[in-house]
């Protein structure tokens, strides 16, 4: 079909689109709405707008009812839903986030005191011969473990899945390796035996408890988690840097790595203290 698309400034140019690739993971219709769902099982900071826009535009032109594009991501027992709109249906750049929510199929009974008890019960292990993590999103570390449990992935495949640059793929794979959850096998990354047991826990609470144990087995994270859970707020940069004494890192490097420790501690707090997903 011939479509008008906006060029530079307010100039419109007419473009012919022939057999554009388009797929829909789910469609749900009511009397007033058609909801189009694009679903993923990997946590990326970005996505291709075309995946929502092409199906939206096709149905929006043919239906009188509202067409609602929704982006769905599933990871670690949580469904993340993002509802968008195109303020100008003729311009894919007019995409805007309307609302977002998280849902779970079961409630969580893992509270802050239970998590603190888990941390205190774990004896720290010797520091592994792996670079100290510099991967700020622990959610993405967990999600990567989910993906490689389904199928071993090469560095290039990890880069493509998350829209990373190659260096970021190394950071996240090595973060999972640092925790003893993943390992390189030839040209791919796979879960260790322990990592597979952790990620294949059928219950969300059991899986999160196992992840907290893996964190607490590393001395710096154990100290940061104990401080954070006891006070209900993430340990300070100074406290985290003090816990890093003995790692042989410069002060500047310690401060950069402290941001990863703080973000991972925040993940634990979010998991057990607040931000509880709504139940279906």
Where are these regions (language model features)?
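Active-site beta-strand-loop-beta-strand hairpin of nuclease catalytic cores
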Residues: 27-36
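Donor-sugar nucleotide-binding helix/loop cap in glycosyltransferases
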Residues: 94-280
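Single conserved hydrophobic/aromatic residue that forms the stacking wall/gate
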Residues: 2-12
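Short, hydrophobic/π-rich interface segment
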Residues: 37-63, 237-256
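Short, positively charged
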Residues: 30, 82, 90, 98-104
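Nucleic-acid nuclease catalytic cores
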Residues: 35, 40-48, 59-89
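Short glycine-rich loop/turn motifs
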Residues: 21-26
């Amino acid at each position: 079909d011939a479509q008008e698309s906006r060029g530079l400034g307010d100039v419109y140019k007419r473009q012919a689109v022939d057999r554009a690739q388009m797929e829909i993971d789910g469609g749900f219709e009511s009397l007033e709405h058609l909801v189009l769902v694009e679903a993923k099982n990997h946590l990326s900071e970005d996505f291709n707008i075309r995946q929502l826009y092409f199906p939206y535009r096709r149905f929006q032109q043919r239906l009188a009812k509202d067409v609602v594009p929704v982006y769905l991501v599933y990871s670690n027992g949580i469904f993340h839903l993002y509802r968008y709109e195109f303020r100008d249906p003729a311009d894919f750049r007019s995409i805007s986030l309307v609302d977002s929510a998280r849902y779970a199929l079961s409630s969580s009974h893992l509270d802050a005191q239970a998590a603190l008890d888990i941390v205190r019960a774990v004896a720290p292990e010797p520091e592994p011969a792996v670079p100290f993590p510099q991967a700020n999103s622990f959610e993405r570390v967990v999600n990567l473990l989910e993906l490689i449990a389904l199928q071993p992935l090469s560095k290039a495949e990890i880069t493509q899945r998350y829209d990373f640059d190659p260096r970021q793929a190394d950071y996240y794979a090595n973060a999972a390796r640092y925790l003893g959850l993943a390992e390189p096998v030839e040209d791919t990354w796979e879960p260790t035996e322990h990592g597979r047991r952790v990620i294949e826990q059928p219950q969300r609470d059991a899986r999160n408890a196992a992840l907290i144990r893996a964190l607490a087995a590393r001395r710096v994270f154990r100290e940061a988690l104990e401080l954070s859970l006891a006070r209900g707020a993430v340990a300070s940069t100074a406290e985290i840097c003090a816990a890093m004494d003995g790692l042989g890192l410069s002060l500047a490097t310690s401060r950069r790595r402290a941001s990863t420790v703080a973000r991972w501690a925040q993940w634990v707090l979010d998991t057990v203290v607040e931000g509880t997903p709504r139940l279906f």
